[in-house]
């Protein structure tokens, strides 16, 4: 196990903890025991955080990001802690969205979508959706513990990815808190909506002005250098943004948030497409003469 040396909170950390306790409604955990509990996930790593915040709502996240930014620290969003690569541990402030921000907000069975908070566990969402014959498509092995926010961060998929693809293929909208504490909704925007947003002097406006320009500038590199595979969780999804622009579809930055591992903002709410639960399933054992022959049989 890779581990950091245990350390008592510094005076600056103590000051940060006191300010967090004074400004948010959720829990602020800073004891050695709490820090040790949150120093691990399903990976081999052990890294003690400065402290842990369990926000009760988006307002708590806004306050936390503003205070953490003022103290020149980092934020580590955390859901179910099922990461195998250490994405939910770090030396900054761990933001545990699974404790309170775990509700299913709205489910529309007719239009087949669901609004959930980022800490909602996939199995819980699927249990509710199953009453209407629906479910979330991608099915990672950690479904019983994985949070939707974690699935967004990791661009999760599962054993049936050939049928359902990645979670990026099912995201309709994401609410995100950016580093400056601003709350934005990344969903399909009409040209008029984009024009209205970009008139303002805000971080959101800068993103909508500069990212399309950046993608256009490096369009050829994105086309030629991104892997020509459909199951890819490496890097930022600039290729998906480029495809939106080339198709002339309503522009959204949601594909860029998916797979970003919490580095671009903290996801608070997600609108997901739902799929029908198969009425029948079966298992087939198919024999091939070689590994290459079996790979060639897989649809691309």
Language-model regions: role of each:
Residues 103-107, 116-298:
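FAD-binding subdomain of flavoenzyme oxidoreductases
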Residues 1-70, 80-114, 141, 263-281:
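N-terminal flexible segment immediately upstream of the FAD-binding catalytic core
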Residues 72-73, 133:
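Cytochrome P450 catalytic domain signature, combining two hallmark sequence patches
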């Amino acid at each position: 196990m890779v581990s950091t040396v245990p350390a008592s909170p510094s005076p600056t950390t103590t000051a940060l903890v006191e300010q967090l306790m004074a400004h948010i409604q959720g829990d602020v955990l800073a004891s050695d025991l709490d820090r040790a509990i949150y120093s691990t996930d399903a990976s081999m790593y052990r890294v003690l955080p400065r402290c842990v915040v369990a926000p009760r709502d988006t307002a708590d996240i806004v306050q936390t990001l503003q205070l953490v930014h003022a103290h020149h620290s980092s934020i580590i969003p955390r859901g179910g802690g099922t990461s195998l690569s250490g994405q939910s541990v770090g030396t900054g402030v761990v933001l545990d969205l699974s404790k309170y921000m775990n509700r299913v907000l709205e489910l529309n069975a007719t239009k087949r979508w669901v609004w959930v908070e980022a800490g909602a566990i996939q199995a819980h969402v699927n249990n509710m959706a199953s009453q209407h014959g629906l479910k979330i498509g991608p099915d990672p092995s950690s479904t019983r513990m994985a949070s939707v926010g974690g699935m967004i961060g990791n661009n999760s998929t599962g054993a049936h990815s050939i049928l359902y693809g990645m979670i990026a293929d099912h995201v309709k909208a994401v609410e995100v808190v950016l580093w400056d504490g601003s709350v934005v909704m990344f969903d399909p925007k009409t040209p008029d909506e984009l024009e209205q947003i970009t008139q303002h002097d805000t971080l959101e406006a800068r993103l909508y002005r500069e990212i399309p320009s950046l993608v256009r500038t490096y369009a050829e590199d994105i086309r030629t250098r991104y892997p020509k595979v459909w199951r890819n969780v490496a890097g930022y999804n600039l290729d998906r943004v480029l495809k939106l622009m080339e198709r002339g579809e309503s522009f959204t930055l949601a594909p860029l948030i998916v797979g970003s591992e919490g580095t671009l903002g903290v996801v608070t709410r997600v609108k997901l497409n739902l799929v029908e639960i198969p009425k029948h399933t079966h298992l087939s054992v198919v024999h091939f003469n070689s590994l290459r022959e079996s790979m060639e049989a897989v649809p691309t």
